[in-house]
Design a protein with these regions (language model features):
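Short beta-edge/loop segments at beta->alpha junctions of small alpha/beta modules
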Residues: 1-80, 115-118
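Residues that recognize and position ribonucleotide moieties
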Residues: 11, 81, 147-151
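Leucine-rich, amphipathic alpha-helical/linker segments
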Residues: 87-88
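Phosphate-handling catalytic interfaces
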Residues: 91-151
Length: 151
């Protein structure tokens, strides 16, 4: 398929990222993005995590049971999401236990989300850091599945 490269490079992606990709290829018609997503959702190649957030299912895998990396989902829930709290310890391999709750910090976290076996809970950046413009102080950017994540 002609969009396989995008799907390989973006195991979890937003509708905005797909729109930018389609525009860069000159394929941005009025309903191109919607019809492309609808087609791939029908065929089981893409699953919707929440409105505007999607995960790719490899060819031949069973869409309802294929494990999707929860860290990638947590890092894409908002444009400024940072994996935080116990989730950051898990990501770095320093946690003593594994949780099914993924915690991320953001300036305006959306409502809690449950997707498959994980619960995603947002926490607001501390107001003092936001006022000082240092919401991402001490945040490192790590790579996972070829995608940058803020932890």
């Amino acid at each position: 398929m002609k969009h396989d490269r995008f799907f390989r490079e973006h195991p979890v992606f937003t509708g905005e990222e797909l729109g930018e990709y389609l525009a860069s290829r000159g394929e941005m018609g009025a309903r191109t993005q919607e019809s492309l997503l609808a087609y791939h959702r029908r065929t089981g190649r893409v699953v919707q995590v929440r409105r505007g957030l999607y995960a790719v299912i490899p060819p031949g895998a069973d869409a309802p049971t294929y494990p999707i990396d929860p860290f990638l989902i947590g890092a894409k829930l908002t444009p400024d999401a940072v994996l935080s709290h116990h989730t950051a310890l898990e990501f770095h391999g320093r946690a003593h236990s594994v949780h099914t709750r993924i915690t991320y910090s953001a300036s305006r976290p959306p409502a809690a989300l449950r997707f498959r076996s994980h619960a995603y809970q947002g926490a607001r950046f501390p107001h003092a850091l936001l006022r000082a413009g240092k919401a991402h102080a001490c945040v490192v950017t790590a790579e996972r599945a070829g995608m940058p994540l803020r932890v």
